[in-house]
């Protein structure tokens, strides 16, 4: 099968890659580009572990073809921290112990980042709704919601 050449922007950097027409963006990110933060939990878009932001829209990268990233902006968990400085969401997830095994954590962080970009002062209900596409089998959701609430407060003051 002939490869597809793709030029895109990932976490602010121009990136070019060659992928197969049927290869998912998740597989491209992980296997071709070494960006292993997004995880494959289900492969059907049900769990949110592979969440990324594509042109300011939260998507499951397991449902997007790698070729569809042509000319678009991709944001992954790897782009959240700046050097050793964690994003406020990452910091608050640590402080609130809002993670355990870590499989779901990158997806939750990206979904929360997307939510707060669109709604910087969400209610608890809005946070729960905004994160409803992400599943956690270990920690539960209360610590995650509290971490997002706390991060929203910090980010408003920044």
Predicted regions and their residues:
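Signature of N-terminal electron-transfer/Fe-S-associated modules in redox systems
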Residues: 1-158
